[in-house]
């Protein structure tokens, strides 16, 4: 882990970019508060557009930045500019990293305190603002800035942009929530 302010600032800048120049489709895994959900998402961070389909029931959500309209199966909702930063559903938060509560802002629960580059990925070590004994992590592709995962003791977000025959059997040692485990085939 590197705690030098210069390297941490560079890593934070790359992470906040969130792959802004890249449009992609992915599978999004969200776990927390005793629930696990999987979504098929399409995201264009630079265009500020996204759509998500919950795999368990097929319900959909999407956002149109031209009209500031959130479309859901229940109908449309026009949003104000002030509402947008905290309006991203869990399914697309990794596509828009600034929506995560990890940057040390007044409204955030965590702040980055160290970074590590391993292979093609960079991981930010996060420390809880109120309880410095609680940690989390945020991992992104170093080159593109596209987020891959966000782990805290109470929440998990993970994006899978392509299926791989072998991911090396990575074991993070814990999963957030209680009473449920990850769906079969998701590590």
Located regions from the model:
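N-terminal leader/targeting segments and the immediate start of mature chains
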Residues: 1-49, 55-57, 73-88, 105-117, ...
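Alpha-helical adaptor scaffolds
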Residues: 88, 95-96
């Amino acid at each position: 882990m590197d705690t030098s302010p210069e390297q941490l600032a560079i890593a934070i800048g790359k992470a906040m970019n969130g792959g802004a120049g890249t449009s992609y489709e992915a599978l999004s895994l969200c776990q927390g508060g005793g629930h696990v959900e999987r979504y098929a998402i399409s995201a264009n961070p630079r265009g500020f557009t996204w759509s998500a389909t919950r795999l368990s029931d097929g319900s959909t959500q999407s956002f149109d930045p031209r009209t500031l309209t959130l479309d859901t199966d229940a109908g449309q909702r026009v949003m104000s500019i002030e509402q947008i930063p905290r309006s991203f559903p869990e399914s697309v938060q990794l596509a828009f990293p600034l929506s995560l509560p990890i940057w040390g802002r007044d409204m955030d629960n965590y702040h980055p305190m160290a970074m590590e580059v391993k292979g093609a990925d960079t991981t930010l070590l996060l420390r809880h603002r109120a309880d410095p004994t609680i940690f989390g992590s945020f991992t992104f592709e170093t080159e593109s800035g596209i987020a891959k995962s966000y782990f805290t003791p109470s929440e998990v977000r993970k994006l899978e942009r392509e299926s791989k025959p072998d991911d090396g059997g990575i074991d993070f040692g814990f999963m957030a929530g209680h009473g449920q485990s990850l769906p079969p085939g998701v590590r």
